[in-house]
Amino acid sequence: MVMVDALNLGRRLRVRSTAYVAGEPVPFSWPMRTFISRNPLYGLEHMPFEQAVRRGAELFHARMFLPRSDYQRWQREGKVRQDTLAEEIARRAQALPAVPGIDWPRWLQALMQSAHDRDVVVPGVRAPDVHAALHGQPPSAQAVDVAVLLPALEQRLHGLTLPEAVDALWGTRLADELDELVIKSYLDFFDEDQSSWRMPGRERGLFAAWSEIAQRNARMFLRRLHVRRTLGRVQDPESAVVHVMEEMGIDPDAWSAYFTRELTRLYGWTGFVRWRSSAKHYYWAQRYPAEVVDLLAVRLVVGLALLQESARHRRTPVRREQLDALLHERGAECLLRNALHSGEVLPDWAQRIDDTLSRGGSKRCEALLQRYWPLWQARQGQDQAAALRELAAAADATAALEVLSPEDIAGLIQGLQEFARQEGMVWTLAMEAQAIDQLLAQVQVPQDLAAGKRPFAQAWFCIDVRAEPIRRHLERVGDYQTFGIAGFFGVPVGFLGYGKGSESHFCPAVVTPKNLVLELPAELDPEEDDLLSTLGHVLHDLKSSVLSPYVTVEAVGMLFGLDLFGKTLAPLGYSRWRNRIDADKPVTRLLVDKLTREQADSIIRTLQRAMIVKALHAELHIERERVDDDMIRELRETALRHREGPTRLQRTFGVSDKQEAEFIDKLREVYRVDADYASYQLVRLGRIGYSLDEQVNYVHTALTMIGLTKTFSRFVLIVGHSGQTENNPYESALDCGACGGASGLVNARVLAQMANKTAVRERLRGMGIDIPDDTWFLPALHNTTTDAIELSDLVLLPPRHLVYLDRLRNGLRAASRLAAAERMPKLLPQARAIEPAQAWRLAHRLAVDWAQVRPEWGLSKNVYGIIGRRSLSERADLQGRPFLMSYDWRCDPKGRLLENLLAAPVVVGQWINLEYFFSTVDNARLGSGSKAYHNVAGRFGVMTGSLSDLRTGLPAQTVMREGQPYHEPMRMIALIEAPLDFAGRALQSVVKVKSLVLGGWIRAIVIDPTQGYKPFVFNNGQWEERPPLVAPAEEEHAA
């Protein structure tokens, strides 16, 4: 077989870059273990929001707003601001074509109150046919002009891939078959040890490995797909892409758009490959590389084979020019084919059209089209006339409709069609306006703590909306002051947990931590020499058995059987019992400080000595007890080239010169006892811990960020959070997004340990922050599924604090029960009249019930992002809807802290908000459908059934209840407490957030304390002034 000409480097790079750019509208998709919320339209954020949703609907074949009936339900519940609805309708009506006698606002109001969700405009309808139907007349008799009808069909087909175009005209399933075939190949390649079969050659990359297998693949052979014809002629994915595109006759100027269409068909897989190819730390990506161009090449090669196979059996086109020729030479046939397979054919005519197409012949098709098309147009006209009559009656404009000319009717249809694209946006704006009013009605002028008043405890929570209820209840049950901060607490942590074999990242997904924290048994004294040996084992072995070595396979099977019955019949009791028998992990502490050079050198020496002992046993069968420390030291010095000549190995064990030389070489090359590798190890050890300067900086930044620079309590709780669920592939979606979809406890422990250090506090005192000696930073974990708060690292608690521990726990437990009592009725409507203790028990049961598809609502109904002092909103019951970010503009003279909040938590909050927005409006396409049909794919993703696109959004159970939306899709409303010009400068400085606000992706409010706490709402490109906030009542303030 003839090999195509190899592409030169320049052309290969152009193909790769075109493929990369074509995939940019698709957002990254992280593995399910670290579910990260992201805006599904992230790749379109450079556009205004309203323009982006139109483009997103085209790209992802998805709905961007809910059906009208859902918004009408919320309107009846008082969640839609009526005057905003009227204002938006009036404003948009001005841009519609003027039609005599048509009062556009009245018609549009009637449309939005229609009892039907269906579109008011019938696709492809002609105004003269509507006019005739309105007046009970038959349509005008005129010959069907194929040349007039073809351009619309041609334009539609040119927006499709060639397999999709063939499907549209022949009713085949080429595009679906293509998806199914490549998904199976993707599963084989990307599998992370879930499958018992391993695709060979994966280390060479996706396309190379797949092309080797595909040429002898049974699925391809049985399907009679001759991929070998193409694969035998190409050398790499880039040449495969070029070959296929040229074989299909696609104009090079259209390649980028064609690639985008291909890549968005399975945008979950595309998003995963886009993320994976950029994740340099991801083990599987390094071991088995894959790029977007690989993904595209596989699709194109299989797609071409499907086209060729279809051409052999049905004489369908393989090249674009063949399709164009078919449209122009056999236009009537193409129109009939499209009518038959579009799902819009008149039922009585389907069989006749099918028979005629089977018999063929241009004249036969032309004759049938002349008979069928007028009937179809007449039916369209009648359907449109009926819809207009109903709408006119609702608008009290029947008389105005009846006198319209065909030209006027065309203008009416055009206007209604244009408004139909905007209706969802109008509903959304009116809901957001109501939400803004509700927020401004509840927040109040903030008040500082009375001078000298010291709360019993202060607690830092993640900004996550699920923290709002428990913060509110904690403040009301006792003398507690709470703060909100991003859940990684500003400290990116690389973490090597006790008994774990690989590093985990606890920080936002877009950040790579520079520092590594080790978890060690608490009984180890950091000053003891044994710690160095322990570190050597941790860095060398990286393993710890969960079950004792003598536990047999049968015992594990028995435990699984107990799981099956226990989790099903008595989930709560069984969970408690299982936790007791699994509690083999010792109490631990974290190694947060940097190692000294002497410690690092000692660890490396320990590792090298261990490797020499291992080598002696493996290579020369010499046991440890037969060698002494001096011999090991001598071998180490020789391997490092610090000494020359024979070693005691020869004299003691009779090893020859050659054997000794080979052994020394193996020590260097295989066991890495080598000076160069020692330098590398030294660099790696340099990642362990944080320097004193770094620790001071992290603690200082966190304190000033939340405005806590004085009046410290005895207890300062740093509360991370995570969810708890059983049998749920999406469990990481319930954890802390700021920690990369993991628990926030590690970060809380790290920051608390830093803040409790005397050296750190001394440096902070010199920076104007004086933390009292009796203040203790205590890490804790908020379980968002049960609302329990568990204190951590109590072994480090100073004895003088123990007397207050019961009071602290009692307050936390009371707040947790009250929060559960608030949350359970939202989760289970039958639990409305429930006591806090009952709600607490119910929440714990749901958390361990493996049949429970919705143990909590997650972040559903999130809508607000509040940046300001807690006292601004602490008297408000915001129902778990705001991201609460503590901030005091008076502690931020240059605005840098506000800029950081806007650049990180606000942007992440917007991602979360729009993940919920789009997962709600089209759960089938932009969400992930029902959990009931989910299956784990390759241990990295979730599919619906056994074969589907990777499901990247939120499951229906997270955003829907009984088939109706539970989440209310609105854009995030970000409220900032700061002077207007101060906040404006910060918004201008953070380019990304400026773009999001100006583009309408975020709704912004500024409450200006220098102008009597007057709110300013950013709307239509300008700041709109609102009445000042009310001050809290005197008795409230005194309390």
From Swiss-Prot:
Describe its membrane topology. Peripheral membrane protein
Q: One MF term from GO for this chain?
A: zinc ion binding
Q: Which GO terms describe its cellular component?
A: plasma membrane
The record's similarity note reads: Belongs to the inorganic carbon transporter (TC 9.A.2) DabA family.
Q: What is this protein called?
A: Probable inorganic carbon transporter subunit DabA 2
* Species whose genome carries this gene: Nitrobacter hamburgensis (strain DSM 10229 / NCIMB 13809 / X14)
Known function: Part of an energy-coupled inorganic carbon pump.
* Listed cofactors: Zn(2+)
Question: Which residue windows are transmembrane per the record?
Answer: none
Which InterPro entries does the record associate with it? DabA (IPR018752)
Q: How does it assemble?
A: Forms a complex with DabB.
Which compartments is it annotated to reside in?
Answer: Cell inner membrane
List keywords of the entry alphabetically.
Cell inner membrane, Cell membrane, Membrane, Metal-binding, Plasmid, Transport, Zinc
Q: Give the domain of life.
A: Bacteria
- Binding, Zn(2+): 462, 464, 721, 736
